[in-house]
Amino acid sequence: PAVSEAFALNKWQIIEQKAATAMKLCCLITVPASVGMWVLAEPISLLLYGTAKAGVAIMHSAPAICLLGLQQVTTGMLQGMGHTNLPMLNMLIGIVAKLVAVCQLTNAEYGIAGAAWATNINFGVTALLNIIALYKFSIRFSWLSIAKIIAAAAVMGAVAVEAHVLLGGASPALATIAAMLAAGISYIVLLPLFGVLNRQELRQLPVVKRFLK
């Protein structure tokens, strides 16, 4: 809606600002979610299903969280700018890419991981085409900020793994939940350290602002 309003008023600077903010928020949420699910796939499987056998499916499905988020956010941007047909066309291309990937990857060699990556390819192709379209309309994103988010999420993932290993003697459920909490806390701490969020932006987060004076 914010992009649509700015587009109606022909305020391109505001459109670019809103688009950059939306992309940053999307990555702030979906990148650590994907990393966390990837590194804790087997413990999560054990926690939810009582077996680690679903860990492979969970791990290889993890990138879909981020890729789907990018697809949805960029689709909203294009629609807000009045280009309603482009996201649909890009989505159709993504579906075709998925069908090709399913034929190539869904076999005995790749197993369920192949099916998961076919879905990742679907979302990834659509998101990439949307981003290319946005660039053609002079919408730019701060890739440096996104790179910092990825770096913070990577460190967070390492913290999650280490925490789970250290708590390996506890019950699997307790170790997994504690690892998730440690990962979440470390990620929040890392964001300002990596220069992703400043103090003013942190104050806008309901959970964090109560700890900041």
What are these regions (language model features)?
Residues 56-57, 141, 145-149, 153, ...:
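Residue-level signature of transmembrane alpha-helical entry/exit and packing/kink sites
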Residues 1-23, 75-77:
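Helix-loop junctions and terminal segments of transmembrane helices
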Residues 20, 36-66:
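Interfacial segments at transmembrane-helix termini and the short loops linking adjacent helices
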Residues 161-213:
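Membrane-proximal transmembrane or re-entrant/amphipathic helices at the cytosolic face
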Residues 18-38, 47-48, 91, 95, ...:
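Short alpha-helical transmembrane segments in multi-pass integral membrane proteins
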Residues 56-106, 112-134, 179-184:
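Short runs within selected transmembrane alpha-helices of multi-pass transporters and secretion channels
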Residues 24-32, 63-67, 152-159:
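Hydrophobic alpha-helical transmembrane segments of multipass membrane transporters and ion channels
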